[in-house]
């Protein structure tokens, strides 16, 4: 059933209808459309369009339809309705007859779809926040279990300084906490109701839009009808949050893919999140992580696409805005799936501590400690940096770590070096000295874990 037609003397070409219809994707707004219609029916009572008895009849029919949709959502796609609004109205008319045709009084699909989409966004943000916090908790638990797992930290993919696997986990907790904050911020701004703004100029009925917003669970009503039906900032904000969040998950995946390689060998992934090769029987591929990394691109694309769609649009509603949904739905679905999958990857991951320790002891990750030692002996840092560089070259030439060079060799580079240098060069000393807030010392890591646990409850 089309919601328009009196103006036209010819039927729409079937090819145009297929091109124009949006039911194949906006069917996902069915529950929100029904909930919004119930609230609108209540508002129509306050302005005398519906009697209380009529409203009760409509609400009962809409609630029955809501339960029917929840039980069998696939029925929507069996229809040839133009969009979800047409489908809901058609089903309502089937149930209550002519009374169903009164429901759209004073309402436009422009404010209707804007309301539906915001309600859907609120519901989905709630799911994303839950999944985000679950992943944070999984990372914190993994950190707690691996506080003593020393491994190399990297810059430029070169071994740099020793860290712990716990400290690595907590780095991603910080990123996810920012993702959580971005979602909460976006939720505050989208929590305003556009219902009652009509096509663009507002409704001709003196409806209390603040009351209407409250019925729908919004914090307040929007202040400008023209902006309200034109606004898709919430779509951009959520896509932006998703794009950033997926970058974090992609980096998480890339790190673990590297840690899982035979060359690094720091972790082993569970069989539950890996797959094999059809040819090479020895293979155990990190497919879950590779898919997380790969899916990041499609989310970035959704954000870029929506920015380009909106950038040249005049106010108010334009059919271009129908393109807001597919990218948003796909991006947030993808982000949610990847959050769940990342948590599953952590469930069963094995940290290979001996290999991590061995790698941390290689690559001269304690060179900075030797430079700091020289500074403590009164050598200017730039000079100390140069001295240690020369010592590293000699250690490489001899095929030894710095701590295995005899004192006589070390003193060739600086006479201030004494026997007290050797405890300084141990991995544990390297960790213990990083005791400022945010550092990798055992005390700081333990405090960070406790803080995260308290924040996450």
Curated annotation (Swiss-Prot):
Per the record, the coiled-coil ranges are none
Molecular-function GO terms, alphabetical: argininosuccinate lyase activity
| Its EC number(s) | 4.3.2.1
PROSITE patterns per UniProt: FUMARATE_LYASES (PS00163)
Give, as one word, the top-level EC class.
lyase
A Gene Ontology CC term for this entry? cytosol
Entry keyword set: Amino-acid biosynthesis, Arginine biosynthesis, Cytoplasm, Lyase
Query: Where in or outside the cell is it found?
Result: Cytoplasm
A GO biological-process term:
arginine biosynthetic process via ornithine
Q: In which pathway does it act?
A: Amino-acid biosynthesis; L-arginine biosynthesis; L-arginine from L-ornithine and carbamoyl phosphate: step 3/3
Q: Which reaction does it catalyse?
A: 2-(N(omega)-L-arginino)succinate = fumarate + L-arginine
- Give the domain of life: Bacteria
The similarity annotation says: Belongs to the lyase 1 family. Argininosuccinate lyase subfamily.
NCBIfam families per record: argH, PRK12308.1
Query: What is this protein called in UniProt?
Result: Argininosuccinate lyase
Source gene?
argH
